[in-house]
A protein has these predicted regions:
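Membrane-interface helix-boundary motifs at transmembrane edges
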Residues: 28-37
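Individual transmembrane alpha-helices with interfacial aromatic-anchor signatures
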Residues: 71, 111-129, 136
Length: 144
């Protein structure tokens, strides 16, 4: 089980690095990226699986050398949930008091792209934070 936890941990690092880079580049270029959203969801699934495996290891009396490993292991899930909450409010913040249906089609499209860009930026930053936390978790594990 510890080996699986290590392998999934490496996947968490790789997937969040890829999502962070992909989302950051797409955000910078001001172009929506379908590829980013698939990477993001895979990274989030890996984080969830990693936390579950870590919980199983705790319940089977495996302990890391450093107790900070628990904090660095759980925080990525917390960051992911907070980022999803922030993403959910991105459309509301972008729209403000504007009546979307009353806007002309080209303005609707521009506003929709602005919402997607804001959501992508929020989630890309969260992947960067999770990447940092996962690297710290790896550094406090017994595997290294």
């Amino acid at each position: 089980m510890a080996v699986l936890h290590l392998v999934v941990g490496c996947a968490v690092i790789a997937l969040n690095l890829a999502a962070f880079a992909s989302g950051g580049i797409a955000w910078y270029r001001d172009r929506p990226s379908v590829h980013f959203w698939y990477l993001l969801r895979a990274a989030q699934a890996a984080v969830f699986l990693q936390v579950m495996l870590g919980g199983l290891l705790v319940f089977t009396n495996h302990e890391p050398d450093d107790s900070l490993h628990y904090l660095y292991g759980i925080l990525p899930l917390v960051v992911s949930l907070i980022a999803e909450g922030a993403r959910a409010g991105a459309a509301e913040r972008e729209l403000g008091d504007v009546d979307f249906e009353a806007l002309p089609a080209d303005s609707q499209q521009s506003l929709a792209l602005a919402i997607v860009r804001r959501e992508m930026g929020i989630m890309a930053v969260s992947c960067g934070v999770i990447l940092f936390l996962a690297l710290r978790a790896a550094g406090t594990s017994t595997a290294f």
